[in-house]
């Protein structure tokens, strides 16, 4: 077992753990499970930090793969989905998840430029990134049969699905007010500006 292989395994597990933690944390924040116990800024900062950590760990994982002599990955193999000859499906999912992670994480820093709506839309990539990273780890990881690693995969998957169901349920249970109704309510009661005409005044 070489030092490169140890780094590959370790960085891969750390990267997945941080991706899972970032996804779970984001769902917990969006479902308002913290209430007002913690201010929004620290919650966002921690979410951001988890994403950055996952991005760095994934970068280390990819660099270590190009240095290992067992499979002999090249830069094209770790940067272009579907090119690698070893476990092509698993590696393609890993590469795609890396790009998804990069887009979601870096979107924090251009939020003011792209706007809240676009930023939220981009953030939906986080779910695909998590699923891709999970399948990549299961298919390509040499530690998949390890009880601790299996527990991490199963536990994170259950948490993400459970929190996602909770979020959808809460959104459906929250009544939405149409835009016109909100505008009318903000302006107060509407009165008829025309003067009252007594009945029979035209006779």
Label the predicted regions.
Residues 1-203:
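Membrane-embedded alpha-helical bundles that constitute the cytochrome b-like, heme-associated redox core
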């Amino acid at each position: 077992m070489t030092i490169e292989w140890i780094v590959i395994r370790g960085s891969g597990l750390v990267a997945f753990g941080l991706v899972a933690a970032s996804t779970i944390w984001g769902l917990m924040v969006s479902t308002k499970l913290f209430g007002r116990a913690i201010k929004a800024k620290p919650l966002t900062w921690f979410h951001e930090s988890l994403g950055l950590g996952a991005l760095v760990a994934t970068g280390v994982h990819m660099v270590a793969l190009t240095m290992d002599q067992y499979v002999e990955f090249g830069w094209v193999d770790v940067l272009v989905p579907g090119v690698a000859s070893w476990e092509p499906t698993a590696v393609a999912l890993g590469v795609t998840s890396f790009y998804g992670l990069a887009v979601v994480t870096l979107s924090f820093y251009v939020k003011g430029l792209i706007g809240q709506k676009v930023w939220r839309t981009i953030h939906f990539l986080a779910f695909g990134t998590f699923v891709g990273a999970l399948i990549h780890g299961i298919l390509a990881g040499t530690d998949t049969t390890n009880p601790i690693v299996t527990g991490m995969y199963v536990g994170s998957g259950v948490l993400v699905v459970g929190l996602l169901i909770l979020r959808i349920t809460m959104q459906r249970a929250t009544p939405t007010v149409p835009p016109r109704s909100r505008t009318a309510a903000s302006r107060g009661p509407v009165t008829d500006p025309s003067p009252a005409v007594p009945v029979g005044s035209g006779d």
